[in-house]
Curated annotation (Swiss-Prot):
Statement: the UniProt record of this protein carries the keyword ATP-binding: no
Positions annotated as active site in the UniProt record: S62
Keyword Cytoplasm: yes
Any GO MF annotation of the entry: protein-L-isoaspartate (D-aspartate) O-methyltransferase activity
Summary of the function given for this chain in its UniProt record: Catalyzes the methyl esterification of L-isoaspartyl residues in peptides and proteins that result from spontaneous decomposition of normal L-aspartyl and L-asparaginyl residues. It plays a role in the repair and/or degradation of damaged proteins.
Gene: pcm
Organism from which the protein derives: Shewanella oneidensis (strain ATCC 700550 / JCM 31522 / CIP 106686 / LMG 19005 / NCIMB 14063 / MR-1)
InterPro entries: PCMT, SAM-dependent_MTases_sf
Entry's family note: Belongs to the methyltransferase superfamily. L-isoaspartyl/D-aspartyl protein methyltransferase family.
Protein name stated in the entry: Protein-L-isoaspartate O-methyltransferase
Length: 211
């Protein structure tokens, strides 16, 4: 990272701490990840604003607060193996890869997946496996997962993702259409408990359509 980018990332982490993010490992990952790397040059000047930004293909890079919040919720359960549904720009994956031993990530838009893979390689993050496919179906061959994070809003909770959770595993997912709720779902053998965290706004999770 350049000195300017490092200063900007550190300042962003401080803003997120002021906004309620408490996990020091999450704040450290935010502070040392160059968010401008995950944006077009035309938007690089907005990289350290606490806002979602377009990345093309009708998709967005999530607001840093939401990235940090979802990561914090996941880390409370100390997951060893995590599935991310919706690689997008790769920014959320870059944060997670610094914090969990093994990350699997699925993206349905090939162009975004290729870019994300290149970015994480550039950051020397090598504990990440990438799949081009329908995130609604998860990644069965690599399951089970201690944690699953979905970075797009599902109209309903995908059964495939629930089935790929390990015992005691958690699913962090925005659910809903116009009004969306960020939910944490925990597996207890063959039953699940759910908790509403807060109201959020995400692009929709598309079922079965590759691009």
């Amino acid at each position: 990272m350049t000195r300017v980018a490092l200063t900007s990332a550190v300042n962003l982490a401080k803003k997120l701490q002021d906004a309620g993010i408490r996990n020091p490992a999450v704040l450290k990952a935010i502070s040392q990840t160059p968010r401008e790397l995950f944006l077009d040059n035309a938007l690089a000047h907005k990289a350290y604003e606490n806002t979602a930004l377009p990345i093309g293909q009708g998709q967005t890079i999530s607001q840093p607060y939401i990235v940090a919040r979802m990561t914090e919720l996941l880390l409370q359960h100390q997951p060893q193996k995590v599935l991310e549904v919706g690689t997008g720009s790769g920014y959320q994956a870059a944060i997670l890869a610094q914090l969990v031993p093994e990350l699997c990530t699925v993206e349905r838009i090939k162009a975004l997946q290729i870019q994300a893979r290149q970015r994480l390689k550039r950051l020397d993050l090598h504990n990440v496996s990438f799949k081009y496919g329908d995130g609604w179906q998860g990644w069965l061959n690599r399951s089970p997962y201690n944690g699953i994070m979905v970075t797009a809003a599902a109209a309903k909770i995908p059964e495939a993702l629930l089935s790929q959770l390990a015992e005691g595993g958690v699913l962090i997912i925005p659910v809903g259409e116009e009004t969306q709720q960020l939910m944490r779902i925990t597996r207890h053998s063959d039953r699940f408990s759910s908790e509403v965290i807060e109201t959020v706004k995400f692009v929709p999770l598309v079922n079965g359509e590759l691009a």
